[in-house]
C-alpha cells in the first residue's frame, strides 16, 4: 500500500449524510467504514458523526459523515442535517421491501431541501450477504437508480465487507464531478446539529 504524508491544511471537507429507513444497516456501514468492524446491533435512536482523513484518487480530503436515525419522529431533525450535506447515501435493505419503496421519498426530500433538480447521491443496496432473505433484486435496484439518475452499488457491512469503502468513495467522486469547487478549497466548518449535543467524532487517517 502506498504511503504519503497527510497535508496539514487546506483540505476540502465533504459532508456525507447516510439516510434510509431504520434497520437497513446505516450504522453498520458507517462503523465498518470508519472502524473496520461489524456491529450487528446498534441503538437506532442515536445520530452520530465521524471524521476521517482519506486519500481518494490521489487527492486528500476530510470526510465528515453523519449517520442519521431512521425513525419517522426524527424526520424534522434529519431535514436540518440535509441542508448542510454535500452528498447523500440513500440506503435500503435488499431484505426489506418497504425500505426500498421509501427510496423515492428520501430522494424527493433531499431535492426539496436542497431546492435542486439534482444533487450528489448514491443508491446503496445493503445486506446483500443475506441472499436467502433477499426480496429486492439487483435489476430492481438498478432500475430505481436509473429512474433517479444516480449511481447504484450493492454492499454488505458483514465481515468480509463488500463495497463499503467504495460506496463512500464513489459518493465523493460524484461530488467532485457535480460540484468541482468542493475539491479546490477548504469548506468553512459548520455544525451538524446546531446547539444539540454531538455524538462521538472519530478522526482517522487512511491511504487508499
UniProtKB/Swiss-Prot annotation:
Domain of life according to the entry: Eukaryota
PROSITE patterns referenced in this protein's UniProt entry, alphabetically: RAS
Annotated binding of GTP, by residue: 21-28, 38-40, 42, 44-45, 70, 126-127, 129, 156-158
Gene3D superfamilies referenced in this protein's UniProt entry, alphabetically: P-loop containing nucleotide triphosphate hydrolases
Cellular component, GO annotation: plasma membrane; protein phosphatase type 1 complex
Expression across tissues: Expression highly restricted to the brain and heart.
Membrane topology value: Lipid-anchor
Requisite cofactors: Mg(2+)
Subunit structure: Component of the SHOC2-MRAS-PP1c (SMP) holophosphatase complex consisting of SHOC2, GTP-bound M-Ras/MRAS and the catalytic subunit of protein phosphatase 1 (either PPP1CA, PPP1CB or PPP1CC). Interacts (active GTP-bound form) with both SHOC2 and PP1c (all isoforms) to form a tertiary complex; SHOC2 and PP1c preferably bind M-Ras/MRAS, but they also bind K-Ras/KRAS, N-Ras/NRAS and H-Ras/HRAS. Interacts with RGL3. Interacts (active GTP-bound form preferentially) with RGS14.
GO molecular function, one term: GTP-dependent protein binding
Membrane-spanning parts: none
Clinical disorder: Noonan syndrome 11: A form of Noonan syndrome, a disease characterized by short stature, facial dysmorphic features such as hypertelorism, a downward eyeslant and low-set posteriorly rotated ears, and a high incidence of congenital heart defects and hypertrophic cardiomyopathy. Other features can include a short neck with webbing or redundancy of skin, deafness, motor delay, variable intellectual deficits, multiple skeletal defects, cryptorchidism, and bleeding diathesis.
Organism: Homo sapiens
Family: Belongs to the small GTPase superfamily. Ras family.
Covalently attached lipid (S-geranylgeranyl cysteine), positions: 205
Effect in UniProt of substituting residue 22 to V: Promotes GTP binding
Outcome when changing residue 23 to V: In NS11; constitutively active form; increased GTPase activity
The EC number(s) this enzyme carries: 3.6.5.2
Effect listed in the UniProt record for changing residue 132 to A: Impairs SMP complex formation
Residue(s) carrying Cysteine methyl ester: 205
Residues reported in the UniProt entry to bind Mg(2+): 27, 45, 67
Protein's name in the database: Ras-related protein M-Ras
Amino acid at each position: 500500500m502506498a504511503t504519503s504524508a497527510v497535508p496539514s491544511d487546506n483540505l476540502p471537507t465533504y459532508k456525507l449524510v447516510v439516510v434510509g429507513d431504520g434497520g437497513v444497516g446505516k450504522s453498520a456501514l458507517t462503523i465498518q467504514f470508519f472502524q473496520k468492524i461489524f456491529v450487528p446491533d446498534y441503538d437506532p435512536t442515536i445520530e452520530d458523526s465521524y471524521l476521517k482523513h482519506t486519500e481518494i484518487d490521489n487527492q486528500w480530503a476530510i470526510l465528515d459523515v453523519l449517520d442519521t436515525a431512521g425513525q419517522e419522529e426524527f424526520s424534522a431533525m434529519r431535514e436540518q442535517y440535509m441542508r448542510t450535506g454535500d452528498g447523500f447515501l440513500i440506503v435500503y435493505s435488499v431484505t426489506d421491501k418497504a425500505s426500498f419503496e421509501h427510496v423515492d421519498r428520501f430522494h424527493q426530500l433531499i431535492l426539496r431541501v436542497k431546492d435542486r433538480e439534482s444533487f450528489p447521491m448514491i443508491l446503496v443496496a445493503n445486506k446483500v450477504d443475506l441472499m436467502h432473505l433477499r426480496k429486492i433484486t439487483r435489476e430492481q435496484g438498478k432500475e430505481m437508480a436509473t429512474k433517479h439518475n444516480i449511481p447504484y452499488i450493492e454492499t454488505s457491512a458483514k465481515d468480509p465487507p463488500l463495497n463499503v469503502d467504495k460506496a463512500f468513495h464513489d459518493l465523493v467522486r460524484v461530488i467532485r464531478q457535480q460540484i468541482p469547487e468542493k475539491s479546490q478549497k477548504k469548506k468553512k466548518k459548520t455544525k451538524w446539529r446546531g446547539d444539540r449535543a454531538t455524538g462521538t467524532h472519530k478522526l482517522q487517517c487512511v491511504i487508499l
